A protein has these predicted regions:
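Bacterial N-terminal signal peptides that target proteins for export
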Residues: 1-10
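Bacterial Sec-dependent N-terminal signal peptides
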Residues: 19-47
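Active-site catalytic microenvironments for nucleophilic, acid-base chemistry
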Residues: 135
Length: 367
């Protein structure tokens, strides 16, 4: 009998809780919970006005450089931090190609980053960081070990060997050139440039029904808080903007779209889905701990999930970094930074697609 009474009481509370914003003496309940309703805004339609679009190039504490081989269709993008910056990362895909990412774990002896490298070439492309380290050392950047400078560099690569020439990959020389360019000037260019040169999307059916993608950028300001995102979109899945598919798997004649999710569910192309990765970095002026930065990267990944379908699969190496630029000067809640980053992530992914569109003839020539 007591059990029935308890269950009935729980159900009544649950029903009331579900309607707390519509009935059950809403205002009285809120006052009992200690919520100040005096200046509450019930209509959130004006919330978008609080967020201001910001050119990525206006972010302070970061400079971007690129280098690519347009014949081989592969390249490198270097994010250089004149003042070494704290960072963390989350690896969400099943097949990453990366350098020094474990160093960014909050449980490690984390050191500030001098540069972050994105490249093509899959595991071969990791050689690009050797050139980046050399460039940084030449310019006097790095952790002072007492025996010389040790530049702290992390890297993630996309698999672009199926586009262009697979026997030519980013190497030490290309990495050196991209870093030299980053130190000399700030060039956050979108589309088929740098690490985005060989990026493609929508590949459950192979390259013949995939489409070109690239690298994209977006940034926003909320009060004094600034958040920017750079992303190389090289996904297995389709790409959506505001719920509308803008790139991805096509029909055989390339005149229409096919759902990448449905293709995976039907398991029609299980032998052709390896070799994908979307790599992104969130940059902010917020002062955050390494643990908080890792959480920001995690929350920001929800922007990927809204834009890429499917995402984080075993056939992807999806990775998200989060960097507090120049140590970060703005105090902000980690949730605010993460949610804003997730929204900016969507914008950057769309930018990567819209800035990299090419004619089908050119695309098919490179596969």
């Amino acid at each position: 009998m007591k059990k029935k009474i308890f269950l009935g009481l729980f159900a009544a509370i649950h029903i009331c809780g579900l309607s707390i914003f519509t009935s059950c003496s809403k205002n009285n309940d809120e006052k009992m919970l200690g919520v100040d309703t005096t200046n509450r805004v019930d209509n959130y339609s004006d919330m978008d006005n609080l967020v201001e679009s910001l050119p990525f190039s206006e972010l302070q504490g970061i400079s971007v450089g690129n280098a690519q081989d347009n014949d081989a269709q592969t390249g490198v993008t270097v994010f250089f931090f004149p003042e070494a910056s704290m960072a963390s990362a989350v690896v969400l895909g099943g097949g990453p190609a990366s350098r020094e990412v474990p160093l960014l774990d909050p449980q490690r002896n984390t050191q500030p980053l001098n540069a972050l490298v994105f490249s093509g070439g899959s595991a071969y492309g990791l050689a690009a960081s050797d050139g980046v380290v050399t460039s940084l050392e030449e310019h006097g950047y790095g952790y002072n070990t007492g025996y010389g400078l040790l530049p702290i560099v992390c890297q993630s690569c996309i698999f672009d060997l199926s586009y262009g020439k697979s026997n030519i990959r980013p190497d030490r020389e290309m990495g050196y050139k991209a870093c030299q360019n980053a130190i000399a000037s700030n060039s956050p260019l979108s589309g088929n440039v740098g690490a985005g040169t060989g990026a493609t999307v929508g590949k459950p059916g192979g390259m013949a029904t995939a489409q070109k993608s690239g690298i994209g950028y977006a940034a926003a300001r909320l009060g004094q808080l600034e958040v920017g995102v750079a992303v190389v979109v090289n996904a297995l899945g389709d790409i959506f903007q505001d719920g509308v598919k803008i790139a991805g798997m096509t029909t055989i004649d390339r005149k229409g779209f096919v759902s990448a999710e449905q293709a995976v569910l039907k398991n029609q192309y299980s032998d052709l889905i390896a070799g994908n990765t979307t790599i992104a970095a969130v940059f902010t002026n917020a002062h955050l701990s390494v643990a908080d930065l890792q959480k920001v990267a995690n929350i920001a990944s929800t922007g990927m999930a809204r834009s890429i379908r499917p995402v984080f699969t075993m056939a992807d190496g999806d990775t998200v970094y989060a960097i507090s630029l120049s140590g970060g000067m703005i105090l902000s809640d980690v949730n605010t930074v993460g949610v804003l980053a997730s929204l900016v992530m969507e914008k950057a992914i769309a930018d990567a697609i819209l800035a990299s569109k090419i004619a089908d003839e050119e695309y098919l020539h490179n596969i």
